[in-house]
Amino acid sequence: MDFTENEEEYEHWTHIERRVPFQGYRTYVASTYISFNVVGFVINAWVLYVVAPLLFAPAIKVPKSILFYIFALCVGDLMTMIAMLLLVIELVFGTWQFSSMVCTSYLIFDSMNKFMAPMIVFLISRTCYSTVCLDKTRGEKAATLKYAIIQFCIAFAFVMILLWPVFAYSQVFTFYMNPNSTAQEVTVMRKCGFFPPPQIEFWFNLIACITSYAVPLFGIIYWYVSVPFFLKRRALTTLVASSSMDAALRKVITTVLLLTVIYVLCWTPYWVSMFANRIWIMEKKSIIIISYFIHLLPYISCVAYPLIFTLLNRGIRSAHAKIVADQRRRFRSLTDEASSQIRTAIRTIPGTKMKKNEFLTRTEEISSDKIASEAVSEFREGLPSQTSFPDETLL
C-alpha cells in the first residue's frame, strides 16, 4: 500500500475516504478510552457537586483557594474528557472526521490540561504549606479566593505561552493511498497531529517536561514533606495532644504518598515516551498500542487528583454534608408551607364551605333523630307490657 502526501497531484481527483473496519486492537483501545471517559465524567461531576456549593458558602473552614483549585481541576478534566471523545471517534472510524480548527482545539485542550493539572496540584501543595507553616498574614492571604484566582490566571497565561507550537504546527494531515490513474480516483485517510520541526519539538518537550513535570514534582514533595516536620516541631514546643498530632501527621503522609505515587506512575512513562519517539519510530502494532495506553495515563492522574483532595479532606466532606442537610430542611419547610397554604385555600372556597356546613347540619339532624329514637325506645322498655295487665285493672 503506497502512502503519499502530495496534495497538488491529486487535487482534481475523486477522493474516496478510507473506512477501516472497527476491529482488532482499535476495539480494545477505544473500549478502554470510553470506559475511562465515562468514569472520568462521573467522578468529576461528583466532585463538582461536592465542591461547587462550598465555593461561595459562608463560614467554611476549608480555604477558599483550595476549593477553587479543586474546582478548576474538575472543569479542566471535563473539558479534556469532551476532547477525548474526538479521539475515540477517530479510533472508531480509523480517520479524522473533523476540520483542522477542531483538530487544533482538541490538541490544545489535551495539552493544556496535561500542563495545568500538575501546576494546580503544585499550587495546592504550596497553599497547604502556607496556611499551616507560615505566619498568620501570609497564611490568610494564601487561603483567599482572590489570591487563588490571580495565581491560576498567571499559571494559565504561562501555559498558553508554552503551547504556542501547538497553535502553530497542529493540522490535519491527508494521506493518499492506492491511486488509480485511469479512473483518477485515490483513497484518502486523514489524521490529526502535532508535527513541528525536530528542533522545535525537542526544545518544546524539554521545557514542558521541566516546567510541568520536574518542578511540580519537586514542589509537591518539598512542601508536603515540610508540613509534618513543622507540626512535629510545634508539638515539641506546645502542649498539643499526641493523638491529634499523630492523626494530622498520618493524614499528611498519606496525601504525600498518594500524590507522589500517582504522579510518578502516570507522568514518567508519558514523558519518557515523548523523548523516545525521537529514537524509535512507532511502526509495530504492539508499540502503537502501548503508546495509546501511555497516552491514557495522564487522563487517569487528572481524574485521581480531585478525587483524592475531596475524599481526604474531612472539612470538605463535613461542610458538604451540612449544606445538604440545610437544603433538605429548607425544602421540607417549603413543602410544609405549601401544603398549609393549599389547605387554607381549600377552606376559604365558598362552595366547599357551604357543602361542609350542610354536611354538618345534616349530621346534627341525624344525630338528634337518633338520640330521640333511642330515648323513646328506652322509655317503652321501662313500661310493662299491655298483655301482662290483670283484667281487674282495666276500667
UniProtKB/Swiss-Prot annotation:
InterPro entries membership = GPCR_Rhodpsn (IPR000276), GPCR_Rhodpsn_7TM (IPR017452)
Keyword hit for Iron-sulfur: no
Show the GO cellular component annotation of the record.
plasma membrane
Glycosylated at which positions?
A: 180
PROSITE patterns (UniProt xref)? G_PROTEIN_RECEP_F1_2 (PS50262)
Instruction: Cite a single Pfam family from the UniProt record.
Output: 7tm_1
Keyword terms of this UniProt record: Cell membrane, G-protein coupled receptor, Glycoprotein, Membrane, Receptor, Transducer, Transmembrane, Transmembrane helix
Q: What is this protein called?
A: Probable G-protein coupled receptor npr-29
- Entry annotated with the keyword Coiled coil: no
- GO molecular function per UniProt: G protein-coupled receptor activity
- Per the UniProt record, which residue ranges are transmembrane? 38-58, 66-86, 89-109, 148-168, 202-222, 252-272, 287-307
Q: Identify the CDD domains for this entry.
A: 7tm_classA_rhodopsin-like
- Note the topology in the membrane: Multi-pass membrane protein
GO process terms (BP): G protein-coupled receptor signaling pathway
Similarity comment: family membership: Belongs to the G-protein coupled receptor 1 family.
Q: Where in the cell is it found?
A: Cell membrane
Function field: Not known. Putative receptor.
